Amino acid sequence: MPSMIVVGGQWGDEGKGSIIAYLALHDEPEIIARGGVGTNAGHSVFINGKKYAVRQLPTGFMQRKARLLVGAGVLVDPEVFFHELEHLKDFNVKERVGIDYRCAIIEPKHKELDRSNGYLHGKIGTTGSGCGPANADRVMRKAKQAKDIKELEPYLTDVAAEVNDALDEGALVLVEGTQGFGLSLYYGTYPYVTSKDVTASSVAADVGIGPTRVDEVIVVFKSFPTRVGAGPFPTEMPMEEADRLGLVEYGTVTGRRRRVGWFDFEMARYSARVNGATMLAVTMLDKYDKEAFGVTDYDKLPRKAKEFIEEIEEKVGVPVGLIKTGPELEHIIDRRDTI
């Protein structure tokens, strides 16, 4: 069985959480591991009409048979971690989660610096979660590690060893990235970016998967890309236009209103290339064409929606295998057997 990595192709908030949740339940991976930056990115998923938002734990938590892991490359905020254990207690998360003992720790001083620094919080528009300052301490070899926090001891593990052991045994491993290509420290709209690279290569390294062991890379795009905070947004539409189209969204972590734009095919193609996409996922197709809401059969999509998907495939050069047509888990078209 393969390893599968899911990353964002735009500026985050693409709907990765809903794609990951579907894959977790449908494909039944034995391990779901989180890579990415840390608690500055929130993933949301609707289960039976209830919204669950996580910032630290893997979004595939609802797959009760899976081991849930947080890779060594991820920053851990103990306060957020324990809050989510309680928040998700109905899913038996506490007994299934493991944190790599090498994860760097976000301390209160990091959050305070993130929120009080005029450049980071004012100009760049960071979330104030402390990730940038914590990663800076990590680079300077000053950050604490998970193994230094007594309260985390029951959850410590070697994530890289667990993941590679699972792959050796033929198990399916699902790896979650955070944020999106446009926020990558290396490839994004610098300096309006996050504090590390968030492409598929880095996300694989975060959990200890070498490049030869990556089988599938799914890059997620939203039909109308959004961005929270400052920075270039070439296809941004006026807020009045977003209101008219019913495209009003707020960030999971910050609560700030998201800027909205038109689909950027040029960016999508570049993002897919650098991420090494084997497949694309498109979310919120129902926002592009309201008649697509709830459709689960590709052949039954209205013409406008289907032409949009075909245009993405043609211009990006990668097949679209998963299409979200609404907020609930079952609002999805799975074309993976036909592409």
UniProtKB/Swiss-Prot annotation:
Pathway: Purine metabolism; AMP biosynthesis via de novo pathway; AMP from IMP: step 1/2. One of its GO terms (molecular function) is adenylosuccinate synthase activity. Its EC number is 6.3.4.4. GTP binds at residues 12-18, 42-44, 258, 284-286, 324-326. Binds 1 Mg(2+) ion per subunit. Its cofactor is Mg(2+). It is found in: Cytoplasm. One of its GO terms (cellular component) is cytoplasm. Keywords: Cytoplasm, GTP-binding, Ligase, Magnesium, Metal-binding, Nucleotide-binding, Purine biosynthesis. It is an enzyme of class 6 (ligase). InterPro entries: Adenylosuccin_syn_GTP-bd, Adenylosuccinate_synth_dom1, Adenylosuccinate_synth_dom2, Adenylosuccinate_synth_dom3, Adenylosuccinate_synthetase, P-loop_NTPase. It comes from the Archaea. IMP binds at D13, E14, G15, K16, N40, A41, G42, H43, T127, R141, Q179, T194, R256. Mg(2+) binds at D13, G42. It catalyses: IMP + L-aspartate + GTP = N(6)-(1,2-dicarboxyethyl)-AMP + GDP + phosphate + 2 H(+). Pfam families: Adenylsucc_synt (PF00709). Homodimer. HAMAP family: Adenylosucc_synth. Belongs to the adenylosuccinate synthetase family. This is Adenylosuccinate synthetase. The gene is purA.
